[in-house]
Amino acid sequence: MKMKNLEKAIILSLMLSGVGSSSAMALEWGLNNSGTTFDISEASKSYSVHSTTDKPMGIINTNNGILTANDIVLEVRSDSNEAAGFFNDGGSVYTGKNMEITVVGGSGNFMVNGIVNQSTGANNASKFTAGNIKMDLTGYGSELYGIINGSHGINGNNAVDFKAGNITIEANNDGNLIGI
């Protein structure tokens, strides 16, 4: 993304500590769209999440959510857990322009994911459409994936659809598994 686009960006910097769900693995996020229609296409956006204990995600779009965006910059860092840049699930639809994603995962038996586009709900198709995507992924754990695009629901017919322009992925996982 060019600097002139970043100058127009609305910066939402969320340094979260302890915000999350009541589940065993709490989540922290920059933007969570669950089951609603959300349009942020008028300006570029930047989301930053740094977690010392929980599982951070830059953007979560779930439960048949519809998210429309302009250019997006995501920076997600985890000190001690897995991390994901963009998580699209449950029949949700994302339509956007260019993305820059930086994800740094914690050490141990944890995954680092740039983009996860999946559908685990019954009879739902998750769709992800973007322009050019640039990722910088660093892991210190067992697995690192640039893009996971798959349906693994157990009830009904599930599907995924992933479309993007040019994709550039730079990855380092401390000598462990890298899947692009």
What label would you give each PLM region?
Residues L27-I180:
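Surface-exposed loop/turn motifs in large extracellular/passenger domains
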Residues M1-A26:
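Gram-negative bacterial Sec-dependent N-terminal signal peptides
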